[in-house]
């Protein structure tokens, strides 16, 4: 789960950046943050997803992973502060209800990363729940994000009917979506 989640989140970020009007450099930074946001828990993330209910120790690991991931990246030579801040803050929520620091204000790149992370988590199945449909995930995310531009960008770029979805046409025929449409 951990590696595929990071890859899928990075792909959503790659689509979202230009939709937000970000240049290639800023979008690349967002993608790098998505690929590395969970580096501190990659080895256990799949087990956590398979277990369903977490122990208090496992919850502590989850709460600490943003700062631990950023520290591991620093030790590995990453010095891009936007990248590091996005990783550190990708579970923060404006107003202080996020973790690990309970920040009142959250970096814009971190917010974009969080939206992509949440969206991909919603459409991924877990032991304790089925995956949400793209439509339901988009609706929930947009409502929870209170119209944040990153949520809108994901919905517009990912689409309500992404490639691979089976849809019923007005004629009653079934079809498979083969590409994203212009939105």
Predicted regions and their residues:
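Histidine- and acidic-residue-rich, metal-dependent catalytic cores
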Residues: 1-183
């Amino acid at each position: 789960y951990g590696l595929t989640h990071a890859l899928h989140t990075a792909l959503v970020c790659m689509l979202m950046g230009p939709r937000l009007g970000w240049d290639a450099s800023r979008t690349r930074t967002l993608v790098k943050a998505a690929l590395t946001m969970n580096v501190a828990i990659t080895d256990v993330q799949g087990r956590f997803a398979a277990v369903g209910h977490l122990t208090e120790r496992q919850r502590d690991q989850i709460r600490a992973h943003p700062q631990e991931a950023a520290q591991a990246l620093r030790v590995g030579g990453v010095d891009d502060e936007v990248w590091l801040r996005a990783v550190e803050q990708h579970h923060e929520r404006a107003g202080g209800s996020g973790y690990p620091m309970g920040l009142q204000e959250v970096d814009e790149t971190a917010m974009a990363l969080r939206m992509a992370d949440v969206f991909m988590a919603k459409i991924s199945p877990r032991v304790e729940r089925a995956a949400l449909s793209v439509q339901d995930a988009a609706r929930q995310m947009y409502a929870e994000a209170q119209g944040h531009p990153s949520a809108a960008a994901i919905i517009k770029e990912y689409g309500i009917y992404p490639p691979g979805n089976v849809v019923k046409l007005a004629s009653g025929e079934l079809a498979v979506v083969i590409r994203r449409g212009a939105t």
